[in-house]
């Protein structure tokens, strides 16, 4: 039986994972950590877990990683809003532990990223813009998924990523990200390739959080026999 520790257990993603875990055989939620806990509780939390699924806040990541290293606990990180210093921590931890990070764990969003990469090879001279839409209460902007998509495309085309263009003209070597917040929209990401004569748009819409939670649980199971490295969901889906 795979013992999964769930960090952020009282958040929306945590609650969805708790609802979906019974759909999977040979794994269970063995430990929980949430905002009511003290950071030192992460010690026993990691000790009692084979792998941790983390949907909490960036502020606890360093402590979580330290205790995971202490107890050799594998990590699946889905927390968004991470900064460069957090990614350095993940890269360092991945030298000792198998670590999987993804801003979006649904197969649809990762397929969108793959398709965007393939389209970019063909539409090399098209302008690229990303529009992401989420519910009114989402804290981070742009979304982690939008940044993931932009980085995928930018790396292939040698573009700079622009979050807030304001009133300046669009430069030739950039990809822009625009954000909408409102209503109870779960997640919509659109990538537009804009040419002089036509526009091609790739779109993914999540109707609920189920696809994210299922992806996270699959990631925890998949990670069990993997060597130390930093993985993504595209390693699981082989895309």
Swiss-Prot record:
Keyword list, A-Z: Amino-acid biosynthesis, Cytoplasm, Diaminopimelate biosynthesis, Lysine biosynthesis, NAD, NADP, Oxidoreductase
Catalytic residue positions: 134, 138
Enzyme class: oxidoreductase
Catalytic activity: (S)-2,3,4,5-tetrahydrodipicolinate + NAD(+) + H2O = (2S,4S)-4-hydroxy-2,3,4,5-tetrahydrodipicolinate + NADH + H(+); (S)-2,3,4,5-tetrahydrodipicolinate + NADP(+) + H2O = (2S,4S)-4-hydroxy-2,3,4,5-tetrahydrodipicolinate + NADPH + H(+)
Location of the protein in the cell: Cytoplasm
Amino acids binding (S)-2,3,4,5-tetrahydrodipicolinate: 135, 144-145
Matches recorded under Pfam families: DapB_C, DapB_N
Entry's Gene Ontology BP terms: diaminopimelate biosynthetic process; lysine biosynthetic process via diaminopimelate
GO molecular function, one term: NAD binding
HAMAP family: DapB
NCBIfam families with a match to the protein in the record: dapB
Family the UniProt entry places it in: Belongs to the DapB family.
Protein name: 4-hydroxy-tetrahydrodipicolinate reductase
Lineage start: Bacteria, Pseudomonadati, Pseudomonadota, Alphaproteobacteria, Rickettsiales
